Amino acid sequence: MELKKIDHDLTVCKVESENELDLTKDFYFIGKTEEEISLVCITDDVPTHTLEREDGWKAFRIQGVLDFSLIGILSKISTILAENKIGIFVVSTYNTDYVLVKKEKFNAALDLLEEKGYVIVE
């Protein structure tokens, strides 16, 4: 399975309202519930007014379009990383999953996954 590195520093943040969001940005994940509006975006694209934010994330995505019937893809990746004390934060689109890892552990995470047979694509 191929994993594609995302060539950006990312931030996870919380915003007060939808008015803070700029949907013209290329890399933007929005989660909205009755309790909060969360955003994952390129660090340079973080809205000016955030309630909270956590910088220092990097990401890779699972290459290709994943069929909804596939089972265990994220479980295998998360198990490999958890066994090596590397935490993850995952966001998904209709097509695939994006795995975020803190910047200081990102290269170690990719090395571990490569050792387990994953192909890392630039």
Residue ranges of predicted features:
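A generic structural motif
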Residues: E36-C41, T96-K102
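Regulatory modules associated with amino-acid/nitrogen control
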Residues: M1-N84, A108-E122
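A cross-kingdom feature marking solvent-exposed beta-strand/loop segments within repeated
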Residues: N84-V99, K105
